[in-house]
Amino acid sequence: MPKIDITELTQNEVLNLSGHDRGLAARARFNLAHLDEDGEPVEISFPEGFRQVSSSFFQGMFADSVRSLGSVQGFFAHYRFDAPAHIRSKLADYAEQVLGRRDY
């Protein structure tokens, strides 16, 4: 199973990820377009004590993946997040937003 360690982005210096452009850069860095097409699940791990992923960062890094995989369930079956519960909950909300299934 391919693995993405978010510490590669944070360098253990920050506990938040924000910004659409940073999300796009992370998408390119980890070659998510290729991983989206690969049938093998991908584990994404967050550092201990991580606090927040902004919706703009999620949009940049994962919006194309959510659309490509066709559903929130498909996205989370393919990308498996090893993250605190509050982060996983936010990511689920953001994925729903990508597909326009929530009113905000």
Placement of each model-derived feature along the sequence:
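Extended, compositionally biased accessory segments flanking or bridging domains
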Residues: 2-6
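Amphipathic alpha-helical interaction surfaces in cytosolic regulatory modules
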Residues: 9-32, 37-40, 46-92
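Primarily interfacial, aromatic-capped hydrophobic alpha-helices that serve as membrane anchors
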Residues: 87-103
